[in-house]
């Protein structure tokens, strides 16, 4: 879930500091955009409404206090293949979802959608099974594949609920972790 992109953003924040630039300097943002839309997102962090291809911060949203459970199969999805499949048969996000999300001021008001999910799920048939299983778990809401996969997540009202679901998922042989949402962004942490 953004591992390489968040690492790239962290390196850029460190370089900006070494160069005497603010992390939100437009030159740093330009480099981030050249590396990928989600790299630019990690410079902002938190919950936000983004424009363009995901690199332009429109506004920040109040972060949800709900917990999250992440579930992944043993295999991964090739991001390039998922985008190739998507490009062959693109699926726009429904208009009503976009209208709702544009009006949102809190992350809890956003209708979650991932129009890349069908392409990724076609490449790894286990993903729909995980999504369906997660949707059946008590307390899970807004079950969705993250980006091109292979992590599927569900929002859960409590950390205890997310932990319970994660434990049940590992019994199925999947990697799973409970976590929470954060308003943090990539930052330089001083050494000891």
Question: What does each model-found stretch correspond to?
Answer:
Residues 1-2, 34, 43, 50-52, ...:
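Short glycine/serine/threonine-biased micro-segments
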